[in-house]
């Protein structure tokens, strides 16, 4: 068996968690780890002589481990007085070493896994244990304002790619020992750290158990982003509607947890999943709860109005132009007819040309660098729209319709819902081109039936309206004043449903003076 085959066999043994013990022979341990890490130039081996005939080596990943801490907090104490304590309990080592976490391990597979996770491991000759030192470091992105969820009023902190930084940001906001965080490792190759967070006593135990089971059942070699987990654990993978919400905002996650939901943190991504969710939740922005309720209600009504525009306006235009011209006022009908006179295509083809062009421009604006992406989107839309009208490919009313539809889709606060609405426009346009208004009605019936059937971890997707819940209606189409929302949503929370909100009338204060 050549060296490569031996390395592959050793890797397979370690991935299958086969218990290969650490040898007391230092040379054998060094050979095994060297064979295991062959071709990994970022993994560093440093050999040392501790004196009194005792030799050893330390292994770590350069760039993840703080190399300056190795000398100060690991090797120097060993050279001074720890060489005789390596077989002692972790507590003795913990009390002597100035390192946050120290562990002794006898299994080579666990030692290898800890190296990959970013720990340093020290071996000494004649000792069948490896000393795992948690001295992780390296460069990570600092806390910044969320790019995808910026607000005028509210927290400026956003999640980063560091799992423990993200969980700490939530701990800062929810200061209770009832906030539980359960850790998982997913991915045979990546061994990605995943944390399920919930507030014990508020979250429904059945929902939490369901989330745990679904996470444990995930079998995959790599998890690089929370989207992997989302597709594995959602109720209906084939539905166009999202059944989990993702967010970059710690205040949003804290608010979801306090309502009895759970959050799933994934290492190496700033996006945290929350659930269960409803359709109405996807139409809410964090700023709705920071502004005065009258302003929040006005903006929320605008969102629902533009949701209707984003979904139905192109289909209604196609249906009216194709079958129901008599529904238009006479002057408008003549104006549209004169604009469409030189157009060689039916309304559905005209709509598809403009909608697909608009989607292409939107995608180009996202993928291009920020400095030119927005400019390309705006100028591209203006130039292409004007040129298409002048060339007689599309009519001016169609350009207006597509522009209004695009602007309306930007008012939807959650991107995963907005992209679903954009996708559903196309089947509605096809139905409108075949059956007219009746096709739109048919599509709407199918859509509503699907939404009524859809669930998120057993919670109805339209909960609050279907089934109707009086307490939850206060935060669907309107946001009632905080002092009237005295109970948590019963759909998600169990146990303590009281929020403790109470408001004293200022007039009573004046009377008491």
UniProtKB/Swiss-Prot annotation:
Keywords: Cell membrane, Membrane, Transmembrane, Transmembrane helix
Subcellular location: Cell membrane
Pfam family, one: GerA
GO biological process: spore germination
Record GO cellular component, one term: plasma membrane
TM region positions: 262-282, 304-324, 341-361, 382-402, 429-449
Membrane topology term: Multi-pass membrane protein
InterPro entries given in the database record: Spore_Ger, UPF0353/GerABKA_families
Domain of life: Bacteria
Compositional bias of kind Basic and acidic residues: 501-513
Annotated stretches, region: Disordered: 489-513
Protein family per UniProt: Belongs to the GerABKA family.
Name this protein carries in UniProt: Uncharacterized membrane protein YfkQ
Lineage: Bacteria, Bacillati, Bacillota, Bacilli, Bacillales
Gene: yfkQ
